[in-house]
């Protein structure tokens, strides 16, 4: 598990300011044993429920896209209005279960 100081260093090295909101989002995304898939709405809900933090949906959206642009996340477009993000940035295949709306490696 990464420490807050490691997130700060990684963000600064990438040219991103280590704001309180970005650090909280890093904590949710990268302090896990396994990689996972999520939507921006799922992530915002998780932050609100598990960290008891108020971070606007716009901030979550902008941060996720900044992380994607820096190569920390991969975006998987399901259709024109549905995207998932993956913390596993290696090249691999995905399968989308339309019945459960679940993205599977």
Regions inferred by a protein language model and the residue ranges of each:
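Short amphipathic alpha-helical elements of helix-turn-helix/winged-helix folds
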Residues: 27-32, 46
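Short capping segments at the starts of secondary-structure elements
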Residues: 20, 32-38
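Basic amphipathic alpha-helical segments that dock to polyanions
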Residues: 60-70
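Non-DNA-binding regulatory cores of transcription-related proteins
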Residues: 69-105
